[in-house]
Amino acid sequence: MNEKRVILVIEDERTISNFICRALHASDYKAIAASSGKEGLSLFFSHQPDLVLLDLGLPDMDGTQVLSQLSGLPNEAPVIVISARDRESEKVKALDMGADDYVVK
């Protein structure tokens, strides 16, 4: 039997986080959620996710700070930024910092 892929959702808006996690569970993924950058980093190191979905507007730190701490790690999982920030400069910055994709919500 195959193990479920683990996806870490770092998103402070509970409604959005719950929606994403429910959709992932329905698609047979194991979703774990964090509502802050520090919690997200802690869960990243304890669960070794296969993918990270990262919001940039977090309450305790900017998502780019989380991204910079995740980039270049030997166990680096792909990171998809999901943000309300739609300026082209924000997208370019996140991609330059190591994000694998950027989706505007």
Sequence positions of predicted segments:
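Non-catalytic signal-transmission and effector/linker regions of two-component phosphorelay proteins
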Residues: M1-L8
